[in-house]
Amino acid sequence: MKHTLFTYLLAAGCCLPMLQANAKVGDILPIPHVVNTPTHAKPFMLNREVALISDIPCVALQRFLTTNGCTLNASAIAQIRVQKVESIAGAYDYSLPAFDNEAYQLSISENEIIIKAVTPTGVIRAAQTLTQIAEGYDAMGETAQLEAVNITDWPAFKVRGWMQDVGRSFLSIDELKKEIELFSRFKVNVFHWHLTEKLAWRFEVKSYPALTQAENMIRYKGQYYTQEQCRELEAYAAQQGVTIIPEIDMPGHSDVFTHTMGFDMQSQQGRAALKVILKEVAATFPKAPYIHIGGDEVALQDGFLEEMASFVRNELSRKVVVWNPLMNKGVNKQMADMTQMWSTRGNKIAGLPNIDCRYNYTNHFDVYADLVGIYKSSIYYTDKGNSEVAGTISAAWNDTKTATETDIIRQNNQYANIIASASRAWQGGGKRYIEAGGTTLPNTGEEFDDFVNFEQRFLFHKAHSLKEQPIPYVKQSNVHWRITDPFPNNGDASKVFPPETSTDTLLATTFNYQGINYRTHFATGAGIYLRHIWHSTVPSFFSNPANNQTAYAWTYVYSPQAQDVGAQIEFYTYSRSGNEKGPKAGQWDRRGSRIWLNDNEIPAPTWQQPDKDIKQDDAVIGLTNENFTAREPVALHLNQGWNKVFIKLPHANNGGTARDKWQFTFVITDTEGRNAVEGLIYSPDKSLTDDIPQDENLPKLSNTKATHWYRFSSKRSPQLFPNASGAGQAIVSTSSHTTATSEWMFADRGDGTFNIVNRANGLFISPITTYNAPLITSATVPATGWQFKPAATDGFYILVNGNNEINQTKSSQGFKLYNWGYGSLTPGEYRLDDDGCQFSFTLSETTVPTAIASPTSDAKAEVKVVNGRIVTSLPYRLYSTNGRSLPIGRQLTTGSYIVRTAQGNVKVVVR
């Protein structure tokens, strides 16, 4: 039987989703808005003669045909028709100066492709979609083909860009050209080129050649871009539908200018010189509708930016972008035609288009969690662009030196981050802004499903069109953890707590320490921030992470065979900007984090510069192998079967690092670190399925099989419990919780909602009330039911019905339960963070019918119950005797259970 078991598991592993070799419509990224795939329709074969009939010339379309072996013949059977139209039905558009309507319609059948677009840019976007559908066939030696489909697509936001800081670093012109080619495939349409900095001036100024002389640069001496190179790059970008926005930062970040020229930018000499420079910039970038003039992080003299903006507008006929906020001035229309919001303080300027860059600084990102945050976030609180919200730009600031230009791309995870950001901008939406949604990947639900869809598509392209690029990101949506509540360590990172000393073969879900129960929480993802760098502006896994705490995380990894693998492991992501301190020799970080595989500790890497000060803006000193993106993967060996991964995460004295990040990264890869290992199962409950166990803090619904009675209280007043007195009466919370009037069941209505029923009198909490008014009890069943929704605090839930939301009031309202809602009374728009709306639940009692059918046991597998938990060497699933699936690893109460293994079913009785 043992042989049979593992044969089955190997087969199951082979059936897991894998990257197919050839592209399908389901691989298009960004995800198109409207897709209709006809059934049984034949594809359009490439690598043949085609007739191109076009109202709009398009270099990108011609390049696509040539790349895929198509030759033009006006009499060919296969035809491609490009038609200019006045509008695309159903597409969204808004006015943004210098940015065209990009909507298109694409229809593919066996011998005909029809492209409809309002502008030439729309044709380019259609060609980029065709390029993706044809992807992957060359690797298999097959003739590329295009799946039959009808697509209507458009961008929700018109600015979807990336910024490279080449003033502090340097990227070759070939690297930039490659980025434009590859990013444009994903409809990224703006390249913000930050050309000048305090470390170096990279734009050739023929009037002032000393600016680019090696002796006037601090880092990457002598490296700059000639005007001819810039002109060629802009022309190439335009063919791909990419707009370049060159930036000459003024008057700050200008040390090189001041040193070389001998005067400050805001002096009269400086202003005159800048106008000469801007004139050369405009001549070099004839297609650039905007010139970025910076303006931030320095005290501005009155009228300086206004004078420069006026010159750009009136003398050069271009529009002006400035950073937002400025140090000592408010942005106004005299100094800017567009703003780029770069911090929490950067807010939308009414009457101007604004680019959201506030939390999109990849130099601070880890590889996994921050990508989740930026993908699932809306863009500046809105789901589609308008005249005041232009879009987003993903920016990389390289204040800290890295070894190579490839390190800049890899350590900032730029391909994954930029494509995720641009995908959100094209698709629109995002359930919540990152200030509310944070960077934690939900375990289930719409946001999780949306992210998995993105991840699968991105990884397909990583394996094909992006296969040569330095992309550290691998699949993470199947990586599951349990993370404990933080234990108090009193500043001692070495202090040991119960999870670390437990000898259970399956770790518990609750631990008692000094009379206090510490819960565990289910988590998903290869990277988790217990405390984000921008906490509490950006929420973290812990709602209130504090100093001098220790948390633990663990999972069990099922491997169908013994195998050597790699692992990406990290406990502190060093930002690519800011002064820092290297990790201590022999330790993973400066906090004392540790990790074990199968109870064997995994040693820390050999650091190239342990305990060393790493200064930003230094000419020589920079990052080496501190981040896992700059190291080979850790070599590990997985046993056949379950492998325990256990992590200790102290947070003592902020870790002695410049930034307070409390985090971890772990995922198993191939030995090269390029891809996730197929067929592995990450389960902290040793479940062989990818099922997510129900949150143990979420109350169970009562039904005919079992009745569950709960007391509940709010985060605001945890000592007060709602009580029912009589029908039609308000529900008042008191400190009394020993009587049946404070106990409630959540009775399943069978429609995804429930009734809230009091144990003492059978009264219901009625949802019929007005906004900001008391809730009352009812003797009759309500017409509609309540629902649980996760609150902002892990382990807490809100209770909602339509546009009603239960709130625990204060003494001024007599501690009554009120209908709070969100004020707007829009269904689904609930308060997740109000302490009075967040509730926790304590189970008082569960009652079950006395008649229980006796299950049969068809096996005698080695199954025991030790300390109230199932212990077996075999993978198993746990069920109640009535067949309901139960969380694996739970503490069993008195009763009977069925343990299902591959060797059969075993009944166990707990007395």
Regions found by a protein language model. Name each.
Residues 453-543, 576, 607, 644-693, ...:
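Accessory carbohydrate-binding/adhesion or oligomerization-edge regions at the termini
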Residues 853-911:
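C-terminal outer-membrane/trafficking sorting elements
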Residues 579-664:
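Beta-strand-rich ligand-recognition modules
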Residues 692-849:
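Lectin-like carbohydrate-binding module/patch detector with strong preference for beta-trefoil
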Residues 99-290, 307, 623, 645:
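Feature activates predominantly on carbohydrate-active enzymes
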Residues 257-338, 342-349:
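Active-site neighborhood of glycoside hydrolase catalytic domains
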Residues 11-15, 21-155, 322-327, 333-337, ...:
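Acidic, contiguous N-terminal accessory segments
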Residues 333-335, 343-478:
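Flexible, acidic glycine-rich loops studded with aromatic residues
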